[in-house]
Structures are given as C-alpha cells and as structure tokens.
Amino acid sequence: MLARPPTASILLRSPFSCLPARRLSLSSAPPSAFFSCRLSTAATRPPPTAQRALLYVPGSNPKQLKKCLGGGLAQSQPDALILDLEDSVRAEKKGEARRNVLDALQATPDCPSQKFVRINSKQLGLDDLEVLLTTPHLEGLVLPKVHSAADVQLVDRFIEEHGLRETKDKLRIVASIESPLALLNLREIATSSTRISSLLFAAEDFCASSGLIRTPSRREMLFARSSVVTAAKAFGLKAVDLVCVQYKGDEALGVLEDEAREGRELGFDGKQAIHPAQVNVIQAAFTPSPAAIERALAILSQYEAARSSGAGAYGLENADGSSSMIDAPMLLQAEGTLAQARAAGVDV
C-alpha cells in the first residue's frame, strides 16, 4: 500500500498532498502548493486536459468520421472523440472499419478534439493496433473489457514494441471498467501503466455482467460508479461516467442533464456521449458555473488576507449575506474549480 505523505495544512490532512514530510502553515505556503504534486505513479503522464464529453463515432461510417474529425460538429465539438472499432461495428465489418479509422486519422491531423480509438479486446485488438500504430495522429486508446492489470500491460508492451518512436510515449490509455472483477482490481488497473490517463465506467456491460437491473434512479450503480471515481482520484487519473442511452427530444435531454449533474457531483470529470446532441449538455454540466468560479476567486483572494494575519481559517461572505468558514480543504476545492475552468477553456 502506498504511504500518504503528511499534509501541508495546519488544519486537516489532505488526500491530494505529496509534499515532503514536514508541517507547513497556510501563512507560509502558496495556494498552488496544495495542488502541485500527484502520486509518483502519475509522474510521467501527459499534462491534464479537459475530457468533459467523449463522443463515440462508429468506425464503420466514413461520412461520420470525416464530419466529426474535420470539425464539422461546429458548436457541438466535444473535448474528445472515441472512434469505435468495437461494439458499434459488426464482425464482418471490422477490417473495413479499421481502415476507415486509419484513413480518417491521417486525413485530419488538425482535429479540434482529442482523438481516441476504442479497439477490440484480445487478439482482434492487437490486430487493430498493428494498423493504428502506423499513424502519428492517434492520441489515445480506449481498452474495452479490462478486468486486470494484465489486460492493460499486454497492450502497453505492444505499443512499446511496435509504436512509432515519436508518438508512442504520448499515447494515453483509457481503461473501460465493465465487470465485478474489474471493480475488485481497480487499484492494480489504475497503476498498471504510466500511459493510463482515465478510468471509464461502462454501465450497460457492468449491469449485464453483475446481474443488476437498470432503473431510472441509477441507484443500483452508485457503489460501482463511486468506486471508479475513488480509484481514479487516488492515482491522479480522470474518471469518465456512463452513457445516457436517451438522446432524442426534450425529455431525453432532461434525463441527460440530470445524469450529467449527478456524475459531476459524484466526482466524475466527464461523460460518454453517443450522439452530437448530447455534447453541449454534457460539457456545460462539467464546466464550473460563473458563480462557482467567482466564489473560488473570492476564496483565493481572502486567503491572501488571512495569510498576512497568520490565520489558518477565515470567513467568506456568501451572496445571501451569510458567512462560511474557509479552511485548507475549501482552498483545495477552489484551486480545483479554477483548474477545471481553465482546462475547459474558460478565461480565469
């Protein structure tokens, strides 16, 4: 078990701190000190970028690939695209889809979205990689049916042996959590490779393999979703929430908005999308609101005043005239809010 270094706060222990084993007071440490480090397993990972909406695009549809990769979604362009070679592609179309995806990646190097490909599992996935690793325009992979560290390490070794020298160290891996076994092995999956950047919760597969009955409340998946978030945050990874299978009409978008808000409250960084109509709703839900940004800025501003007086905690006046005590954990939350806003392109 990894030991957690002591916190830099005089008030509470912080699970985010990687500072040396000494005590500091809020009056001697800048706010950024509390967010400056991650666990050593994340030391060589690429810098974080927003992954609010991750939109699946069938690899068997060249027209959709061209539109999505070419920036043709206009105001609905997601943070990330997942070009799919797995569930959305019939068995007899796998080879054709593989070629479609490679051609699309080669033709659109300036795509405004991050470019991931969901490969198949087992040998078929290695066949996918043989083709995909020939292009420098692939940014990451979504690995389906990850049950243990071995599933990630197989792909990791293949990338190391066959990837292009100039790009293989930049490739990110998103591990799809789809089974009870994967849930039990979250720790080893999260630390299986320095290429791991995110854990993704695949709700339909998880319910099918667990015998869970899907309900509108989603309460049957609360433990699994929370476990994925906890593991991701423990090791400096992003957590991606489930797909909302409804996308047509106002009622469907209302369900999506509720799901996305709930996912954000649970700690997820983003959510999978299966239709461009879902993108804006998702990205709005995972972007800090103007009020949240304003409050975060006020907390950091008040921090400077408290630091000069040597106070470890201080009060902040709320919009309704009441006051809230602000201490180290809330300072961390404020830093996190501003980091999320900047990653989403908000000028803070």
What does each of the following model-derived ranges do?
Residues 2-348:
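Expand to "…catalyze enediolate/carbanion chemistry for C-C bond making/breaking, isomerization
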